[in-house]
Amino acid sequence: MRKFSISDIEAITGIKAHTIRIWEQRYAFVVPKRTETNIRYYDDKDLCFFLNISNLSENGYKISEISKMSAEEMVSAVSLLSADSCNPCVHVNALTDSTLLFNEAKFLSTLAFCIEAKGLEKTMQETIFPFMRKMGVMWQTGVITPAHEHFSTDLIKRKLICTIDALPNCDDFQAKRFLLFLPSLETHELGLLFAHYIVKSYGHQVLYLGQSIPYEDLDVVSQAYQPDFCITCLTSVLIDNDVNNVIDKIVENLHGQKLVVSGPLILSSNVHPRKNMFILKNLIEFSEFVSSRIVAHEYK
């Protein structure tokens, strides 16, 4: 059994610690456990309870109503919300709950439901990436371990790869060529895999190199493949203290090809403008870029 502090519960559910204390005093529906030194903590069952409260309160239920529900009634109400494809926060919490408990079946069923109801692109935008941002906060606060992150990321990667493989390969010699890669020491691959899906779904050719590609290898590949566009996503601070150094190394090893950059490091840094470089803020912008006249006509 894992032990969660009230700060952990706040980080996971979004319910403020002050609010939790007030609810406990007013409604007494959760009684925190105490250590031998009288420090409050919560267990896995309590966490699931608070996640259900978060789901219900974010969807119009008043706490006075929720406090009168039995555990079974609460689960039933959340299940009804989960059946609504327009409720991304419920699905984010379902993924969070199943990650914390390493419940692969629940994680995959939630993922499958969202994709069937909304398609992969909307699922990534509305559910997966908000979920991953939440995982990031939980990792920073020590609520989850690397094992939790690897568990959820691997399941999402498997689904992405399966969906990408199901798309038809492009044999049109006039189609644009995209080179997708992550630079040396960058291993966060979900954004790049989603870019792979978008590019392939629009009927373009893709050479996908994946994570942590040495800079000097880009020189060889870009000469041999002659891509129209090169795409990378920068996420980890481990790759370099200065994101502009990373971009400079990438550009030095390309041969004038257009570079598309995105990712958390790009958004949080002062990136210097460069010739033939496009900075994209989010997934919606990326989808619009791939379908735009810039790509379709290649400046013709």
Language-model features: where?
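Short glycine/proline-centered loop/turn elements that form peptide/ligand docking sites
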Residues: 9, 16-18, 211-214
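Residue-level recognition of alpha-helix initiation/capping sites
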Residues: 1, 14-15, 47, 190, ...
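Long amphipathic alpha-helical segments
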Residues: 12, 16-21, 25-168
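C-terminal regulatory/effector modules of DNA-binding transcriptional regulators
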Residues: 143-145, 151-300
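A generic secondary-structure micro-motif detector
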Residues: 9-10, 40-42, 184-185, 208
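A short, Lys/Arg-rich alpha-helix, primarily the initiator
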Residues: 1-10
